[in-house]
């Protein structure tokens, strides 16, 4: 089974904690602070592996967490930085932020890397906090939390040739006879629920990847049936092979089928109609096929090359494959969005609205709730087991304006303040 979209959770490693330590060596008077910094947490990195074709592996593992950095040590020894967590993805993977729907990366080339979640920096040891007024601080930071986010991975096939057509016109049968692919084949609609890939090699040694795509029905560009899933997979094919049931086994007119499918491609994305197209007039071994082919050619004219074939008996298949291989040699890729000239070096500045450092809301029990990325990060990096660290955290909140904001909201001595899963008591006349 082919999986073309999957949601996963990624988290960069937390930074290692800084250490509070002092030199205690003999004959070293006033040794001073000697606590080292923590190591950096590992990043979660996507790397394109051209040997992968599907997102199947992500069905079984959906959580990816990079290792945390090593804690700082005494004698000013820094903790070791954690190794990055490498996650391999197939070429053609689009990385989307599940919360904002923003496309973060489009990974197409072998070896291409993308850091999807950065590891946190290591916390500073007490050596970093030494000043003239406080030469022996008992302050150290906890490591910075690593980035965490929910990600949607979407895979678009990087096939050279896409087979399109109504359900049950013979696309799966054609793919099975020209490659080693073994798609499920039956005479009913929507047999091919997922794309099948096959590597095709012609007699003269040329090869290409062919995709038998899910059956298309009228209204696909609006999401009817399997339409959207089908159309996502065809976006990156360079040549379209339109398979038509020339025997009209299901009673439809072959020429009308041709018009309907092309209208769907046109409605979904204008660039799809720019791709060269070949018509594979299938089921020529069946009654009425010859007469239907004659009428079809009269209506189509020279607009598109038509190759009469029978996938079941392999009649005409060899000539079709040679024509496809010839066309691929002269057909460039068709990007859906205009690409900029790579010679033009351009820096893009993206405006992102600055979020407030904190927000204050009121709980039903009267407690004040503090929230915000900046204030939560400060909280997580504070070592509350040490009095000096607690005082430093209180000073940081005061400098951010938290105290004044709480007073404006009506906070009084003894009121409960919540931050994450912790509760504090508001002291209006706190003395540094």
From Swiss-Prot:
Q: What's its top-level EC category?
A: hydrolase
Task: List residues of the OBG-type G domain.
Answer: 159-329
Q: Which GO terms describe its molecular function?
A: GTP binding; GTPase activity; magnesium ion binding
Per UniProt, residues of the OCT domain are 350-428
What Enzyme Commission number does this protein have?
A: 3.6.5.-
The Obg domain is annotated at 1-158
Supply the alphabetized keyword list. Answer: Cytoplasm, GTP-binding, Hydrolase, Magnesium, Metal-binding, Nucleotide-binding
Which HAMAP family does the entry link to? GTPase_Obg
What function is annotated for this protein? Answer: An essential GTPase which binds GTP, GDP and possibly (p)ppGpp with moderate affinity, with high nucleotide exchange rates and a fairly low GTP hydrolysis rate. Plays a role in control of the cell cycle, stress response, ribosome biogenesis and in those bacteria that undergo differentiation, in morphogenesis control.
Name of the protein in its database record: GTPase Obg
Q: Which organism is it from?
A: Geobacillus kaustophilus (strain HTA426)
């Amino acid at each position: 089974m082919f999986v073309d979209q999957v949601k996963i959770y990624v988290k960069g490693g937390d930074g290692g904690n800084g250490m509070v330590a002092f030199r205690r060596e003999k004959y070293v008077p006033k040794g001073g602070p000697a606590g080292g910094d923590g190591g950096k947490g590992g990043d979660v990195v996507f790397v394109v592996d051209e040997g992968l074709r599907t997102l199947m592996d992500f069905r079984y593992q959906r959580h990816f967490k990079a290792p945390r950095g090593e804690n700082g040590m005494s004698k000013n020894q820094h903790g070791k930085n954690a190794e990055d967590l490498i996650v391999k993805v197939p070429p053609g993977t689009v990385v989307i932020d599940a919360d904002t729907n923003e496309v973060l990366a489009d990974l197409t080339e072998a070896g291409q890397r993308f850091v999807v979640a950065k590891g946190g920096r290591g916390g500073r040891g007490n050596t970093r906090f030494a000043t003239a007024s406080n030469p022996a601080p008992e302050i150290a930071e906890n490591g910075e939390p690593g980035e965490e986010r929910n990600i949607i991975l979407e895979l678009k096939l990087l096939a050279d040739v896409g087979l399109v057509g109504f359900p049950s016109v013979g696309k799966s049968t054609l793919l099975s006879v020209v490659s080693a692919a073994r798609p499920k084949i039956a005479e009913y609609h929507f047999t091919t629920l997922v794309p099948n890939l096959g590597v095709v090699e012609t007699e003269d040694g040329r090869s290409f990847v062919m995709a038998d795509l899910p059956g298309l029905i009228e209204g696909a560009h609006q999401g009817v049936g399997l339409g959207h899933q089908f159309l996502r997979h065809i976006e990156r094919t360079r040549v379209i092979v339109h398979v038509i049931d020339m025997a009209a086994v299901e009673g439809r007119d072959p020429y009308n089928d041709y018009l309907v499918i092309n209208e769907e491609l046109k409605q979904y994305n204008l660039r799809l109609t720019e791709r060269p197209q070949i018509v594979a007039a299938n089921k020529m071994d069946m009654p009425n096929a010859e007469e239907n082919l004659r009428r079809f050619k009269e209506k189509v004219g020279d607009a598109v090359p038509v190759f009469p074939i029978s996938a079941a008996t392999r009649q005409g298949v060899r000539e079709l494959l040679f024509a496809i291989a010839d066309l691929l040699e002269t057909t460039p890729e068709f990007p859906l969005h205009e690409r900029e000239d790579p010679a033009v070096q351009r820096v893009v500045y993206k405006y992102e609205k600055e979020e407030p450092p904190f927000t204050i809301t009121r709980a039903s029990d009267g407690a004040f709730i503090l929230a915000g990325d900046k204030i939560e990060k400060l909280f997580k990096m504070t070592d509350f087991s040490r009095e000096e660290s607690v005082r430093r955290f209180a000073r940081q909140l005061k400098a951010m304006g938290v105290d004044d904001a709480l007073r404006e909201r009506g906070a009084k001595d003894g009121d409960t303040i919540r931050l994450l899963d912790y509760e504090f008591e508001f002291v209006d006349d706190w003395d540094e």
